[in-house]
């Protein structure tokens, strides 16, 4: 898979990132390099490899699983410009 200039402009528009026309070829090269690396990762044989959380074996510390409301919902949204029922209200960014 490769990315063309039209796709670069579309991704930039969706991400709300300004990309100058002069920078489009550079961004296109970078995105294609990233996709090539991901394709390399897809070709790695991981059959029989156990899932891991870290490269170094470390014991996972556990805490007691207690459900709480946290008691700080008001403090969390106190500085937000817009909230509704303890939720942040944000503008729509995906069309």
From Swiss-Prot:
Highest taxon of source: Bacteria
Q: Kind of enzyme, top EC level?
A: ligase
**HAMAP family recorded:** GatC (MF_00122)
Against InterPro entries, the record matches this protein to:
Asp/Glu-ADT_sf_sub_c, GatC
Q: Which GO terms describe its biological process?
A: glutaminyl-tRNAGln biosynthesis via transamidation; regulation of translational fidelity; translation
Under Gene Ontology molecular function, one entry of this record is: ATP binding
What SUPFAM superfamilies does the record tag this protein with?
Glu-tRNAGln amidotransferase C subunit
Query: Which protein family is it in?
Result: Belongs to the GatC family.
Q: Which organism is it from?
A: Beijerinckia indica subsp. indica (strain ATCC 9039 / DSM 1715 / NCIMB 8712)
Documented EC number(s)? 6.3.5.-
Looking up NCBIfam families in the UniProt record yields: gatC
What is this protein's record name?
Answer: Aspartyl/glutamyl-tRNA(Asn/Gln) amidotransferase subunit C
The record's note on quaternary structure and interaction partners says:
Heterotrimer of A, B and C subunits.
- Pfam name, any one: GatC
Q: Which UniProt keywords apply?
A: ATP-binding, Ligase, Nucleotide-binding, Protein biosynthesis
Q: Catalytic activity annotated for this protein?
A: L-glutamyl-tRNA(Gln) + L-glutamine + ATP + H2O = L-glutaminyl-tRNA(Gln) + L-glutamate + ADP + phosphate + H(+); L-aspartyl-tRNA(Asn) + L-glutamine + ATP + H2O = L-asparaginyl-tRNA(Asn) + L-glutamate + ADP + phosphate + 2 H(+)
Q: What's this protein's function?
A: Allows the formation of correctly charged Asn-tRNA(Asn) or Gln-tRNA(Gln) through the transamidation of misacylated Asp-tRNA(Asn) or Glu-tRNA(Gln) in organisms which lack either or both of asparaginyl-tRNA or glutaminyl-tRNA synthetases. The reaction takes place in the presence of glutamine and ATP through an activated phospho-Asp-tRNA(Asn) or phospho-Glu-tRNA(Gln).
């Amino acid at each position: 898979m490769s990315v063309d200039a039209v796709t670069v402009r579309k991704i930039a528009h969706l991400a709300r990132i300004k990309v100058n026309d002069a920078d489009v070829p550079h961004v296109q090269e970078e995105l294609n390099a990233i996709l090539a690396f991901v394709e390399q990762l897809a070709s790695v044989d991981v059959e029989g490899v156990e899932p891991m959380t870290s490269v170094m074996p470390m014991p996972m510390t556990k805490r007691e699983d207690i459900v709480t409301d946290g008691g700080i919902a008001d403090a969390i949204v106190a500085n937000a410009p817009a909230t509704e029922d303890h939720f942040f209200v944000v503008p729509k960014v995906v069309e």
